[in-house]
Protein backbone atom coordinates (compact mmCIF):
# COMPACT_ATOMS: atom_id res chain seq x y z
CA UNK A 1 0.00 0.00 0.00
CA UNK A 2 3.00 2.26 0.50
CA UNK A 3 3.32 2.66 -3.28
CA UNK A 4 0.00 4.51 -3.26
CA UNK A 5 -0.25 6.07 0.17
CA UNK A 6 2.25 8.16 2.05
CA UNK A 7 2.34 9.42 5.59
CA UNK A 8 4.54 11.39 7.94
CA UNK A 9 7.90 9.78 8.70
CA UNK A 10 7.39 7.09 6.06
CA UNK A 11 8.97 8.84 3.08
CA UNK A 12 11.85 6.43 2.53
CA UNK A 13 9.65 3.36 3.07
CA UNK A 14 7.00 4.63 0.65
CA UNK A 15 9.64 5.73 -1.87
CA UNK A 16 10.96 2.16 -2.02
CA UNK A 17 7.41 0.89 -2.61
CA UNK A 18 6.91 3.46 -5.40
CA UNK A 19 10.22 2.33 -6.91
CA UNK A 20 9.27 -1.36 -6.83
CA UNK A 21 5.94 -0.54 -8.50
CA UNK A 22 7.60 1.50 -11.26
CA UNK A 23 10.39 -1.02 -11.83
CA UNK A 24 7.90 -3.91 -11.94
CA UNK A 25 5.63 -2.15 -14.44
CA UNK A 26 8.57 -1.11 -16.62
CA UNK A 27 10.21 -4.53 -16.47
CA UNK A 28 6.91 -6.19 -17.42
CA UNK A 29 6.81 -4.10 -20.60
CA UNK A 30 10.46 -4.78 -21.39
CA UNK A 31 10.33 -8.58 -21.06
CA UNK A 32 6.82 -9.24 -22.38
CA UNK A 33 8.16 -10.04 -25.88
CA UNK A 34 10.27 -12.83 -24.35
CA UNK A 35 7.26 -14.48 -22.72
CA UNK A 36 8.41 -13.40 -19.27
CA UNK A 37 5.78 -12.19 -16.82
CA UNK A 38 6.24 -9.80 -13.91
CA UNK A 39 3.85 -9.49 -10.99
CA UNK A 40 3.88 -6.46 -8.72
CA UNK A 41 2.81 -7.85 -5.34
CA UNK A 42 1.05 -5.47 -2.97
CA UNK A 43 0.53 -7.14 0.39
CA UNK A 44 -1.85 -5.51 2.80
CA UNK A 45 -1.36 -5.78 6.54
CA UNK A 46 -0.30 -9.35 7.29
CA UNK A 47 -0.35 -10.75 10.80
CA UNK A 48 3.40 -10.70 11.35
CA UNK A 49 5.73 -8.88 13.73
CA UNK A 50 6.08 -6.00 11.26
CA UNK A 51 4.18 -3.74 13.67
CA UNK A 52 5.55 -5.47 16.74
CA UNK A 53 9.16 -5.98 17.69
CA UNK A 54 10.47 -4.34 14.53
CA UNK A 55 8.92 -1.04 15.61
CA UNK A 56 10.37 -0.88 19.10
CA UNK A 57 12.10 2.46 18.76
CA UNK A 58 11.82 5.85 20.38
CA UNK A 59 11.89 9.37 19.04
CA UNK A 60 14.99 11.37 19.97
CA UNK A 61 14.47 13.62 22.97
CA UNK A 62 13.42 17.11 21.93
CA UNK A 63 12.59 16.05 18.37
CA UNK A 64 10.16 18.43 16.68
CA UNK A 65 8.65 15.34 15.06
CA UNK A 66 7.93 13.51 18.32
CA UNK A 67 4.17 14.08 18.02
CA UNK A 68 4.18 12.51 14.54
CA UNK A 69 6.27 9.63 15.81
CA UNK A 70 3.90 9.07 18.73
CA UNK A 71 0.86 9.10 16.38
CA UNK A 72 2.54 6.57 14.09
CA UNK A 73 3.51 4.31 16.98
CA UNK A 74 -0.05 4.42 18.33
CA UNK A 75 -1.31 3.33 14.91
CA UNK A 76 1.32 0.59 14.56
CA UNK A 77 0.68 -0.81 18.02
CA UNK A 78 -3.07 -0.74 17.33
CA UNK A 79 -2.50 -2.79 14.19
CA UNK A 80 -0.15 -5.28 15.82
CA UNK A 81 -1.89 -8.62 16.16
CA UNK A 82 -5.03 -7.26 14.49
CA UNK A 83 -3.90 -7.49 10.88
CA UNK A 84 -6.45 -9.26 8.68
CA UNK A 85 -3.92 -10.85 6.33
CA UNK A 86 -2.73 -14.41 6.85
CA UNK A 87 0.93 -14.72 5.78
CA UNK A 88 0.55 -18.47 5.18
CA UNK A 89 -2.32 -17.86 2.76
CA UNK A 90 -0.26 -15.10 1.13
CA UNK A 91 2.63 -17.52 0.62
CA UNK A 92 0.29 -20.05 -1.01
CA UNK A 93 -1.06 -17.33 -3.29
CA UNK A 94 2.50 -16.30 -4.27
CA UNK A 95 3.16 -19.89 -5.37
CA UNK A 96 -0.17 -20.19 -7.19
CA UNK A 97 0.49 -16.98 -9.15
CA UNK A 98 4.07 -18.00 -9.94
CA UNK A 99 2.75 -21.23 -11.47
CA UNK A 100 0.18 -19.48 -13.70
CA UNK A 101 0.73 -19.36 -17.46
CA UNK A 102 -0.46 -15.76 -17.46
CA UNK A 103 -0.03 -14.43 -13.93
CA UNK A 104 -1.58 -11.23 -12.69
CA UNK A 105 0.38 -8.07 -13.48
CA UNK A 106 -0.66 -6.63 -10.13
CA UNK A 107 -1.46 -8.68 -7.05
CA UNK A 108 -3.10 -6.84 -4.16
CA UNK A 109 -3.35 -9.08 -1.12
CA UNK A 110 -6.06 -8.45 1.42
CA UNK A 111 -9.21 -6.41 1.35
CA UNK A 112 -7.44 -3.64 3.25
CA UNK A 113 -5.04 -3.31 0.34
CA UNK A 114 -7.77 -3.36 -2.33
CA UNK A 115 -9.93 -0.90 -0.42
CA UNK A 116 -7.00 1.38 0.34
CA UNK A 117 -5.77 1.52 -3.25
CA UNK A 118 -9.33 2.06 -4.52
CA UNK A 119 -9.90 4.93 -2.08
CA UNK A 120 -6.61 6.58 -3.01
CA UNK A 121 -7.33 6.24 -6.74
CA UNK A 122 -10.83 7.66 -6.30
CA UNK A 123 -9.30 10.60 -4.44
CA UNK A 124 -6.83 11.12 -7.27
CA UNK A 125 -9.64 11.12 -9.85
CA UNK A 126 -11.53 13.74 -7.81
CA UNK A 127 -8.39 15.86 -7.56
CA UNK A 128 -7.80 15.67 -11.32
CA UNK A 129 -11.41 16.68 -12.00
CA UNK A 130 -10.99 19.63 -9.64
CA UNK A 131 -7.63 20.67 -11.12
CA UNK A 132 -8.52 20.15 -14.80
CA UNK A 133 -9.28 23.82 -15.42
CA UNK A 134 -5.99 24.83 -13.82
CA UNK A 135 -4.01 22.20 -15.71
CA UNK A 136 -5.40 23.26 -19.07
CA UNK A 137 -4.15 26.83 -18.57
CA UNK A 138 -0.71 25.57 -19.62
CA UNK A 139 -1.91 24.26 -23.00
CA UNK A 140 -1.30 26.11 -26.27
Task: Specify the residue positions occupied by each region the protein language model found.
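Active-site segment of SDR-like NAD(P)-dependent oxidoreductases
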Residues: 1-5, 45
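C-terminal beta-strand-loop-alpha-helix "lid" module of Rossmann-like NAD(P)-dependent dehydrogenases
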Residues: 36-79
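Core catalytic loop region at the nicotinamide-binding pocket of NAD(P)H-dependent oxidoreductases
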Residues: 38, 81-119
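Active-site helix of classical SDR
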Residues: 16-19
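Active-site loop immediately N-terminal to the catalytic Tyr-X3-Lys motif
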Residues: 5-11
